[in-house]
Every structure is written in structure tokens, then in C-alpha cells.
Amino acid sequence: GAVGDGADARTELLRRQPRALRLLLSSTFTDTNEERNYLLADVLPYLQEYARRLGGLEAQIVEMRWGIREQASDNHETSEICMNELERCLQESFGMAYVFIAAQKYGFRPFPNKIPREYFEQLLQVLKSQEDRQPHDKELRDMTQLQEWFQLDQNEVAPEQEHAPVETEASAAFRGPRGPYYVLKSKAKCDDWREKFEAMQKALRKAAFELWPQETSEQAMKDPSKRHFAQRFLISVTEEEFTRGLLLLSEENRKKRALVIKRHIKGLEEATDKGEEKPEGQRKGEFIDLIGKEANLDTEAQKRLKAQIGMTPEDLVVFEGVIDWGPGINLGSLDHVTYLKKMADALCIKLKDSILEGAKEVSVEPDTVVEEAARHLRLSIHVNYLGFVFCHFLA
């Protein structure tokens, strides 16, 4: 009857509604290991228990430090996998979906693993012209590696868009023409890939600046609505996540979906890695962008980072910490451990609130019942966590 039909409809609605807080933790990796470890060990288990008791919900933190399989890395799919995970969080989470840890490292800037034929051939023309003008520039002579490593695939064509664009989707201009593409070969059997990558990266970046001066200008880079394929030679994976996980959201959605943690280490720029070999987690180069054999500060990367952080809405900053260089983040330092605890507590409060709001949306009970359950939970959850619990989700 009608009553049964109503119950069935309500059950179906609940089945389709997201029942998890699914969150992408976005940052450069080598400089935020301790923050990530602390959040996964201390905050995640608490949120999981809180969500479970609040109506059988889930809390998930997507951790990409171990999320890129070797084969995917060899095929240069790191950026694509990260963006897919971010999109999945935005689609599947009933609340917060993106947390950005803003520190002092801009991070990995891969060039696209697929370049539309017309763009690739234009870039080669620019490099050839630059080489004719500057025959002794070694960076330009490395353009021959582009011809060796990129191969035209006539069958590689992006599908027609069959759905209405979602809010966080990269624009058509950022995706570029549909193909065919020049596709980057696998690096699986290349022992000196890093050197080859850096040579091609410099050459492509130099050509992109000349070919697309307007699209790569500071003004264009500050406007997420004007993203262009040219910028894919310049921006880091972390900034692309930041653009799609925060900047492209409406002002109303940002407040429900994104949070930012800021950290500044005093004395980092003055520190040095020269002299004795430092253990992992204590090297300056893990915490800030360095370039070349002399390990000088990468001023271009730092400029991009400053611009990115400058675009962060202040009302989304849940915590801001300032600490002294350890070296690194030193778990033997009371100041550093206090910083980690305060950071985790501030984030936990916001995520707990997000879970509570999500519980109201997916629950068939009145809001007052959910709030009463939440009050009991705040009193009843007292758990000691020994060691680290890592939760890892892949697409």
C-alpha cells in the first residue's frame, strides 16, 4: 500500500545518500609525514568510532603516500590518480572532502603525460626557434629527448563529454584539445629518468612561457576560471588539487567541503644540508623546494607557492602553527609535539561537526535525536591509541 511504498522510497533514498565522510588529505609528502601520521593515528580512529555510533556512518581519510602503484608511476599517471581520488571524495562524502596542509614546499610539477598533437608540435617549433637564437643553450639542446620520449598515438582521443560539467571539473581549456595526442613512454626500464625528466621539464616550461605568454602570466595563474593547458607545465600536483578541491567550489560549498591547515617553520630557509649526511625527515630539501646540484632555493617554485597560499580564503583556515626548525619535525621536542596535538584537535573538532551535520541529512530520525546521540558520544568515547592505524583507499 501507500505506507509500504513510502517506506520503500525512504529506504531507497537512504541507500543512495552518501554515508561516509570521505576526505582527501592534500599536501606535499616529504615535509608533512608527521602531520599525516598523527592525523591517521589519533584523529581517524576517533572519527570512525564517532561516525559509527552516530547511525552506522563511516569516516575515511584517503592517503596517497602509498596509493600510487609502481606501474602507474612508470606510466606517469600520478597526477591523474590523485585527481580521480579527489573527485571521488567530492562526490561520495556527505561533508568535508578536502584538507590542504599548506607548508613551505610547492612540490612535484610533472608535465602532462599526454600532449595534444597541435600543442606538442607548436612547442617543438618554439624550441627549435629558441635553439636557432641561442645555439649554446644546453637546455634547448635537450629538446631531442622530447622527440625520443613522446610518441604520436593516432588512436588516443579523449571521449566526447556525455554529462553536464560538475563544479570541480577541469575546464575544457585546461584539458586542451581532444587529441590525437603525443603520449609519454613508460619509464620502467630507464635508469636515469630523473635527469631526463628534469631536462624535458625545463625545455617544455621555457617553450610554454613563450608560446602562451598571456595564459602563463601571473594574472592568469591567479584566476582559476582562466586555467589553460599551458599551466599544466607550471603547476604542482598539489596546486591542481587545491584548485579543484577548493578554488573551483562556490563560496557556500567551500565552507562545507574544504579546510586548510597552515604551518611555517622558522629557520628553514637558513638551514643547510651540506656537511654530514642527515637522516630521512631531517633534510632541508624535504621541506622546501631546492634546485640544481648546488641545492639552491627554487625561487620560481616558491613564488608559485606564495601565490597559491595567497588565494586561500582565511575563513577556511582551521589552524595555523609556527615552529622552529628541528631539524625537521622532531617528536622529541615538546614544542613540536604540542603543535601536532593542537593541529589535530582543531581539525578533529571541524570534522566531527561535519559528521554531525551529515548524520542529520542521512538520518530518518529528527535532528534532536541525532544531537542527543552526539552529546552522549562526546561523553562516552575515550579511546587510547597505541601505534599507528593507516587507512588507505584506492579508486
Which stretches of residues belong to each language-model region?
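Conserved catalytic or regulatory cores that recognize and/or transform ribose-phosphate-containing ligands
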Residues: 1-379
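Walker A/P-loop phosphate-binding element recognition
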Residues: 375-395
